């Protein structure tokens, strides 16, 4: 099964443009918010020289490279965790992915609308982070309500472990930290944490959308 990466960010930051570049697709990309409503999906192959070397040795009938599924998800706005914009749908789409490509607009252009009026990639990152953290906190609070009594009054060992995991996540999220910053030592804890499918536990890569004039200023 292919790894699925979701492209996320505020509206009008270049998500569909990135999707088209990666997948060679022709998804609509326009200068207005929520140009994308239903997710666009594309599949790209992953070049791997090791695969070619193995093929030279084994001479298989077919060589099938690894693929990555790229999903262009509708733009998120402040308040999405409470249903603003396409909030609930957007968050459900993210939950289905394995990793996140977070696009940040880092260029000024008066001809391209910014939903918050001005370009500020740090603020934009924090908006997305906060909305995902709030949604994760709702998930944690709901789970705590289900296991707390069982963990505190019963003899269910797994319920006690789950309760401790949930409380650790709750503490971090209430401090504005993402779930991926929390670590667990035992396999039981790690399994419970994994099965929560928290949005902020997914690995994330930040993609900075800059203008051509800024390319010469970038140092890798």
Regions found by a protein language model. Name each.
Residues 218-220:
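Conserved small/polar residues in nucleotide/adenosyl-binding loops
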Residues 8, 207-208:
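Generic beta-strand/beta-sheet core signal
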Residues 81-205, 211, 215:
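Phosphate/Mg2+-binding loops and adjacent switch elements
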Residues 1-78, 84, 88, 93-94, ...:
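Conserved G1/Walker A P-loop phosphate-binding module
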């Amino acid at each position: 099964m292919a790894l699925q990466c979701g492209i996320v960010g505020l509206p009008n930051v270049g998500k569909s443009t990135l999707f088209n570049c990666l997948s060679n697709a022709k998804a609509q990309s326009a200068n207005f918010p929520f140009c994308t409503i239903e997710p666009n999906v594309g599949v790209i192959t992953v070049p791997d020289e090791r695969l070619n070397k193995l093929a030279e040795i084994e001479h298989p009938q077919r060589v099938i490279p690894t693929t990555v599924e790229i999903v262009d998800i509708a733009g998120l706005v402040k308040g999405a965790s409470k249903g603003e914009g396409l909030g609930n749908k957007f968050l459900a789409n993210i939950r289905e992915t394995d990793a996140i490509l977070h696009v940040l607009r880092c260029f000024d252009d008066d001809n391209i609308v910014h939903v918050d009026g001005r370009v500020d990639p740090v603020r934009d990152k924090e908006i997305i982070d906060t909305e995902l953290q709030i949604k994760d906190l709702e998930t944690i609070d709901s789970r705590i309500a289900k296991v707390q009594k069982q963990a505190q009054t019963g003899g269910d060992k797994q319920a006690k472990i789950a309760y401790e995991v949930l409380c650790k996540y709750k503490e971090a999220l209430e401090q504005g930290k993402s779930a991926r910053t929390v670590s667990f030592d035992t396999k039981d804890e790690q399994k419970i944490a994994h099965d929560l499918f928290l949005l902020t536990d997914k690995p994330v890569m930040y993609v900075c959308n800059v203008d051509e004039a800024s390319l010469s200023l970038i140092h890798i």
